[in-house]
Amino acid sequence: MRRALLFAVALFALPAVQAADLHPFSASYTADWKQLPMSGSAERSLTKNDNGSWTLNFKASMMIASLTETSVILFDKDTLQPKSYTFERGGLGKAKKINLDFDQATKKVTGFENKDPVNVALQSGMLDKSTYQLALQRDVAAGKKSMSYNVVEGTDVDTYDFRVIGPEKVQTKVGSIDAIKVERVRDPTQSKRITQMWFAKDQGGILVALRQVETDGKEYNIMLQDGTVDGKAVKGS
């Protein structure tokens, strides 16, 4: 369940396609862990700040477990640039806190993961563990079919690969939504985990659903309950 909360924080290489603009949104989700008699909720939002930066927030809770995640982002020349990233998990297993600053001037990512210092060289296009989800959402909306992101994970940098599977209709509490199914690409010899996401074909490409299957067969799902994009309610048919 802890990994599920982490992931729910936890959400295509066609050079000719321009990535989508940023659209402020807010969404709430139901969260279920199939092998356990419990359910939870999650909220995700993107808002524009007075200084032109953007704030991406995520909150999730399931019984006694909770998780919050916040990224402050610059959007410059069609590129997402993290400024800061905070993460806090409590109530289940080991508590965890992360605070990172992305300094474009010094080309450094500095901060702490719990008590461990972080000092990583900031490469072009590098993202945090929340901002990459927004990049994925934008790239899917732009029509890209496969993509890779370099993501700071504590003192390390990992590569996240994704591919588009195709269009599907998803039944939600706001109706049937035309969505695009995406999955994370992993080396099957290294991990049997399955991660699948459905993004709305329209309506800003908002995340509609997520499915995660762990190596032990446990399955975690979130499903859109309601949401807005550019102040307009997300609607299905």
Could you say what each language-model-derived stretch is?
Residues A4-A13:
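Sec-dependent N-terminal signal peptides
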Residues P15-A19:
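Sec/Tat signal peptide C-region and signal peptidase I cleavage site
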Residues A20-Q104, A141-S237:
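Acidic, serine/threonine-rich low-complexity disordered tracts
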Residues A95-A141:
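Hydrophobic, well-structured mid-protein blocks that either form specific transmembrane helices
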